[in-house]
Design a protein with these regions (language model features):
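Divalent metal-coordination and catalytic microenvironments
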Residues: 42, 67, 79, 96, ...
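Metallo-beta-lactamase
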Residues: 125-228, 323-333
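Cap/insert and terminal regions of metallo-dependent hydrolase folds
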Residues: 99-102, 117, 215-327
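Pre-active-site segment of Zn-dependent metallo-hydrolases
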Residues: 32-33, 44-91, 132, 209, ...
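Active-site metal-binding loops of divalent metal-dependent hydrolases
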Residues: 1-3, 68-70, 97, 123-124, ...
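Zn-dependent metallo-beta-lactamase
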Residues: 1-60, 188-226, 230, 234
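Active-site metal-binding motif and surrounding structural segment of the metallo-beta-lactamase
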Residues: 73-120, 125-126, 260-270
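Beta-strand-turn-beta hairpins that frame and shape the catalytic cleft
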Residues: 46-50, 59-63, 172, 176-191, ...
Length: 334
């Protein structure tokens, strides 16, 4: 799921676009859904040991769903187009507790016939408000309900610190031991947990407040401490870093991924970079691009909340690195 769709984009070695026809007929509606939200199905495997059962299920593949979109059924509809069976997923991971990343979760849980791990930072369950710049208007955000999610089959796992996700479970991540991302039998993904803020220009979400459940008072909550990303290590190529919104800042996110893994080479950065919304977000576009050029990933795939202005500047500055995201696209890094 992404904010953008283009049915005419060509496929490439890296990007496989959604099908338009089957058996010499154009596919009937609905078309792929685009919305102001994000969701990614992530499959990680071991090339030298990948084996498949007769039904196509992988013996040795780690499949997770990262975020769930902003509408009730958008991700479900797109999954049907792509032939995705949600029962193949071993974990759902939330990048943070904003509704454009979790609203589709209940519909997804209904389609999973087993208890499923839901991994997130504990602050994802905060009750949050937005106070608008005029100082008068405010709006309460939709929030996650732990008990309702448990009734729907979610096994809630809250983690503040980095963790490794495999088919079998969740484990603490020892810093700078990048061999733990992949062992001889089990492909793993790194979830960063809370991301330290080191840049001066990535300022979080200044309009956000959290509700004190005892007093009802609103407390400034600009950092979005629950914001986290997913990291994979592609052998001989470097890190693939996947962000939901990058409220922590996409540069802070990349720096932390490199620190956690001890790997400096970045192969791809994909997801929301949160450089739209005017003001401080657009002020961060130029320093962000300057730093991205220094980091020098092979691919940049801005999605969701990156925004047109920032995406256009990326195309201008590093056209050879840019890949266009479009909902229902499959990106393959191997």
């Amino acid at each position: 799921m992404d904010n953008y769709t283009d049915r005419l984009l060509p496929s490439s070695l890296i990007a496989t676009r959604p099908p338009m026809m089957k058996n010499e007929q154009f596919l009937p509606p609905p078309p792929p859904v685009a919305e102001h939200g994000f969701s990614a199905l992530i499959r990680v495997g071991l090339n030298d040991t990948m084996a498949y059962q007769n039904n196509g299920e992988s013996f040795n593949e780690n499949i997770i769903l990262f975020d769930c979109g902003t509408s009730e059924n958008g991700v479900v509809s797109n999954a049907e187009i792509l032939g995705i069976n949600f029962n193949s997923i071993n974990s759902v991971i939330l990048s943070h507790g904003h509704f454009d990343h979790f609203t589709g979760l209940p519909s997804i849980l209904k389609r999973i016939d087993k208890p499923i791990r839901l991994i997130c930072h504990p602050d994802a369950f905060l009750r949050r408000w937005v106070l608008f710049p005029n100082g008068k208007d405010k709006a309460r955000m939709p929030f996650l309900d732990k008990e309702e999610l448990r009734r729907q089959g979610a096994i809630i796992v809250t983690k503040k610190n980095p963790s490794l996700i495999s088919q079998d479970g969740v484990e603490e991540y020892p810093y700078q031991l990048h061999d733990n991302l992949v062992d001889n039998s089990t492909p793993k993904l790194l979830v960063t947990g809370r991301i330290p803020r080191t840049t001066t220009y990535e300022k979080g979400f200044p309009l956000q407040y959290k509700e004190d459940l005892n007093t009802g008072n609103l407390i400034p909550d600009p950092l979005v401490n629950d914001d986290q990303a997913i990291v994979a290590n592609i052998k001989n190529k470097g890190l693939v870093i996947i962000s939901g919104c990058a409220h922590a800042g996409i540069i802070n996110t990349i720096r932390y991924a490199k620190l956690l893994t001890g790997i400096n080479k970045v192969y791809a950065v994909i997801g929301g970079f949160h450089l739209t919304g005017g003001g401080i977000y657009e002020d961060a576009i130029e320093p962000t691009i300057t730093e991205l050029k220094k980091i020098d990933p092979r691919y940049l795939i801005p999605c969701h909340c990156t925004g047109w202005k920032a995406t256009n500047r990326i195309i201008q500055e590093v056209p050879e690195k840019f890949l266009q995201s479009s909902t229902c696209t499959t990106f393959t890094f191997d």
